[in-house]
Amino acid sequence: MKTILVAGGAGYIGSHMVAMLVKRGYEVVVADNLRTGHWQAVKGARKLYVGDLRDAAFLDRLFTENKIDGVINFAAFSLVGESVTDPLKYYGNNVEGAVSLLNAMKAHGVDKIVFSSTAATYGEPEKQPIEECDRTEPTNPYGATKLAIENMLKWCDGAYGIRYAALRYFNAAGSDTEAGIGEDHNPESHLIPLVMKTALGQRGHIGIFGEDYPTPDGTCVRDYIHVKDLAEAHLLALEYLDRGGKSDVFNLGLSLIHISEPTRRRG
C-alpha cells in the first residue's frame, strides 16, 4: 500500500483529497500548520503532523517516520487581496514552504509531486479558453508565488529527477457530504458560500466586484470545478506520475452557470 503525503491536508481542498485517497486504498500522512485548516476535517489519515513546512527538522522527522511514495502539495496562503497588501507573507509562506518541502523530498529520495497551482498564473488572458502554452503573467503576488514554484519544480526535475504535475484551476466549489466535509473559512471569502448565507438570511447582502463586463448582469464570468472532481484530478495526476509520466502543467475546470441559479433551485 502506497503512502502519500498531503501538505495542507486539513484545508478545504486538501481534506477532500485525503478522504478520496483513503477511500481508494492509500495510506495518507497529512502535514498542516492549522492556520486556516481544521484537524476535524482530516478523515482517515494515518497521522496528522502539525507544523510549518519551512521547518526542516519537522519535515525530516515526518519523512523519517513514514516511507513516503509521493507528495500532493496544497499548502499555501491563497487570498489574492491579502497577497497584494502583504506580498512578503505570501512569498515567505508559499515559496519558502515549497523549497523546504522539495529539499526534504530530495534528501529522502521521494521523486513525485503533484502541485496544486492556480489559473492566476496567467494573469489577464489574451484569449479564452486558456491553454497551458499561453503566456503566464500574474497580476498579483499570490499567482506570482505559484508560478515561481512551478518554475522551481521544472528546474528540480532537471537537477534531481523530481517529476511533477502542476494543476492550474480557478475556483473550487461543493463538498463531500458522504465524508462530512466542506468549506469552512474564517472569514468566509468564497462567493458561493456567501451567496448561500445571504439566501438563508445569515447575511444582509452580497457584493460582487465588477459591473461593466460583457455579461447579462455586468459581473465577471467565473470558472468553477467541484471539489471532488478537483481531488479526482489530483489523484489522476499522481497516478500519471506513478506510471512514469513526464513532468507537465495541466488546466482544470469549466462551469458556465449563474451563481444565483443553483441557489434558487436549492431554495
Which residues does each PLM region occupy?
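Structural/interface elements that position substrates and couple domains in central-metabolism enzymes
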Residues: A119, I225, G253-L256
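Generic structural signal for alpha-helix termini and adjacent loop/cap motifs
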Residues: H16, G37, D86, A104, ...
